[in-house]
Amino acid sequence: MIQNPILPGFCPDPSIIRVGEDYYIANSSFEWWPGVKIYHSKDLKHYEQLPSPLNRMSQLNMVGEGDSCGVWAPDISWDGEYFWLIYTDVKTRTGGLFNTHNYLVKSKDIRGGWSEPVYLNSSGFDPSVFHDTDGKMYIVNMINNFKGILVQQYDPEKECLVGEAKNVFPGTGRGYTEGPHIYHIGEYYYLLMAEGGTGYEHMVTMARSRSIWGPYEEDPGNPVLTSDVDNPEKLQKCGHADLVCTQNGEWYMVHLCARPPKGSRQCVLGRETAIQKMVWNKEGWLRLVCGGRFGQWETEEPAGIPECLFPEEEGKDYGKEDFDLEIADSAGNNETAKNADIAEILSKTKEYLNEKNAVDEECDKKLSMPVKKTSALLDVRYTSLRQPYDSYTSLTERPGYLRLYGQESLNSCYNVSLVARRQQDRYVQVETCVEFAPTCREQMAGLAYMYDTGNFYLLVKTREEEFGSQTLDLKKPAKLRLIKSDHFDVEDVIPAISIPEEGPVYLRVTTTQEGLYAKIFYSLDGKDYQELAEVPTNILTDEQSDGFTGAHFGMYCHDMTGVRRYADFDYFEIVKTRKEQ
C-alpha cells in the first residue's frame, strides 16, 4: 500500500505526468525560492526531489511580493520532446485584487536548462497546458473572481496565444472554481477542477464534453473527491488534483490534503500531497477504487511496477548538515573544506556555481541593498525567501560553516537573509549552532521558526542597549532573545538572557503535542540545554495566518544598519522524534 501523504509538509497543488516509467510531480512554492518544487518517482510511492526549474531571477522576480504570493499552482506536461511548465506569479492578493501573471517555460531535460519565460496572460491563476491528440496546445486557467474556466490555443512556434479565449464552463455552483486540467480520453474531453475553496470544504469535481470548447456536462456523482469534515482523524482539505495513467493502464489522482492534530483544525504542516487509486465506471466517470468520495490514508500500489527506492535520498529529509564542502583530488579522494585550500575549492566549483546559482544581473541592480555573491551550494531541500540565497551566503569564507550576511528584518518582503527547510512532520527537533558578534540591537542572528513575515518565532543572539542611547557600549552583555510575532504584533516571550560575548551558542526547537506546541532551548556547550519556554504554534498555520504555505525552520541573520554583519552557522540538524500515527 502507498501511505499518505506521499509528499509531507508544504507541498500543495500537485501536478503530475508520466514519461515512460518515470513520474514527476510539480508543487506550488509561493514566496519561497527557488520557484516550483519537482519530485521524481518510479513507483508512485518513493520520491526524490529534483532541482527547481525557476532558479533565475529573469524567470521569476518575487522581490517585494507579499506573503503567500509568488508561484501558484504550476502545471507540468510533456509533448514527447519538451517538458513544459506553466505557472502564475501572483504579485498581490489583498482586498480581492489579484494581480496574476501567467508564464510558460520549457526544457528537454527536467533536471535543468529551463528556458526564459513566455508571458501568456493575466486573466486568472492555476494555469495548465493541454496537449491534444492532434498536436495542438491549449492554455487553461480559472478566471479571476472565479467566473469560470478559460481556454485558448497556444502556438509553440510563435510562442504566443492565438485565436479566441473562451469561458468553457462556469463551474458546478459549489463556488471557488479553480485548478483546471483537461484530458482527452476516448471520445470525451474531461475537465477536472478544484472547488469549494482550499480549506475544509475543498473538493474535486469533473465535467465532460465531446469538444474542448464545450458545452460541458457535470458529473452527476460530484464531488469525485473531498473530505469527511465530521471525522477529523481522516485526511482533510482534499482537493486541487491531477490525473496520471500508469504504463499498465491504471489511473491515479494526486491531490492536496492536510493533517490537523486531534481536536484541532490548526495545520502547522500546511497543505501536502496525497494520492488515490481511481477507476472509470461504466458510465465513463472517474471514481475512487475504494468507493465513496473521501480521501484515504492509504491506497493500492500500481500493479506490475516494482518498488523503487532512492538510496542516495535516504536520510536527507532528516539528519545533520555540517556544511563541509567536499572536493576530489586527482586520485578521486575526497576531503572536506575544513582541510582543503580555499583557492582550490573556488577553482573547482567556479564553473558549477556559474551554472547552478546564476542570478540575473539586471535584477540584481534593482535590489535596494548591495549584493555580495558568495554562492553557497546547498541541498535542494534548502530554500530562501523571494530571491536566491547566494547573494548573502558563503561556504568558503570560513570552511565548514555556512556564513550569512545580515540584511533586512524578517518582516520585510525584500532582502531577508534566511536559509530554511520546511517542517515535514508534527514531531521534530531542529538544532543549530551560531557564532555572531553583534554591536547593537539592530543586529540579530539565530534560529527562526516561521510561517511568513508577520508570524514567527526567533531565538536570536543580539546586544542590549539603553533606549535612546547615543553611544555604543560594548561592555553591555550580548543577549539571547526569544521573539514572537503574531500578525506583526512583536513581543519578547521571556526577558532577554545574558550570554557570553564570544563563542558559540546552540539553539534548539522541539515540537510537542502533535505539533501544537514547541519547546525552545539553548546551550553554551552543546550538551547542557536549558528550556526557555513552550510556545503555541497556532500562529504558524494557514488558519491563523490566512496563508497558503507552511511552517519552516531556518538559519537567520539580520543587520538593519546596512553594514551586513555576518553570522557563522556550524551545522543544521532536523530529527524526527516520534513516528507519525
Give the positions of each predicted feature:
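Carbohydrate-active catalytic/glycan-binding domains of CAZyme proteins
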Residues: M1-Q581
